[in-house]
Amino acid sequence: MNATQTQPQNADQQSVAATAKEQGTEARDRQPPLHPETPAPSNTPRKDSLNQFASWLRQDARAEATTYLHRANTHHDGE
């Protein structure tokens, strides 16, 4: 064994093995519910983010239209 490897203590190994065995037995003995309840879909965060995105698009489109109209009204090619 080199200096970087460590050897676990025997007592720790036994307690970890016993805990794992107990947890495995509990999980095996537990029965799944006959009719599991499905969680209610939560559309609120998604809806809010879509509304925010739509609002941002409207603001951006409004700013672009304002800039376009200003340039069209103030810059006349050849006149």
Swiss-Prot record:
According to the UniProt entry, which residue ranges have a biased composition of type Polar residues? 1-17, 40-50
Question: Source species, please?
Answer: Rhodopirellula islandica
Which gene produces this protein? ubact
Function of this protein?
May function as a protein modifier covalently attached to lysine residues of substrate proteins. As this bacterium does not seem to encode proteasome subunits and proteasome ATPase adjacently to UBact, this tagging system may serve another role than targeting the modified proteins for degradation by proteasomes.
**Similarity section:** Belongs to the ubiquitin-like protein UBact family.
Enumerate the residue ranges of region (Disordered). 1-50
Protein name, entry field: Prokaryotic ubiquitin-like protein UBact
The keyword Glycoprotein is annotated on this UniProt entry: no
Keyword set for this entry? Answer: Isopeptide bond, Ubl conjugation pathway
Molecular function, one GO term: protein tag activity
